């Protein structure tokens, strides 16, 4: 599992 910060949108994509 890892969390990748989506720059520009300011949201976080959570991939398990």
Curated annotation (Swiss-Prot):
Taxonomy, superkingdom: Eukaryota
Record keywords: Adaptive immunity, Cell membrane, Immunity, Membrane, Receptor, T cell receptor
GO cellular component terms given for this protein: T cell receptor complex
Signal peptide stretch: none
BP term (GO), one: adaptive immune response
Location within or outside the cell: Cell membrane
Subunit structure: Gamma-delta TR is a heterodimer composed of a gamma and delta chain; disulfide-linked. The gamma-delta TR is associated with the transmembrane signaling CD3 coreceptor proteins following the stoichiometry: a single gamma-delta TR heterodimer associates with one CD3D-CD3E heterodimer, one CD3G-CD3E heterodimer and one CD247 homodimer forming a stable octameric structure. Upon activation, gamma-delta TR complex associates with FCER1G to initiate intracellular signaling.
Function statement: J region of the variable domain of T cell receptor (TR) gamma chain that participates in the antigen recognition. Gamma-delta TRs recognize a variety of self and foreign non-peptide antigens frequently expressed at the epithelial boundaries between the host and external environment, including endogenous lipids presented by MH-like protein CD1D and phosphoantigens presented by butyrophilin-like molecule BTN3A1. Upon antigen recognition induces rapid, innate-like immune responses involved in pathogen clearance and tissue repair.
Full protein name: T cell receptor gamma joining 1
Lineage start: Eukaryota, Metazoa, Chordata, Craniata, Vertebrata
């Amino acid at each position: 599992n890892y969390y990748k910060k989506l720059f520009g949108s300011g949201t976080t994509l959570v991939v398990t």
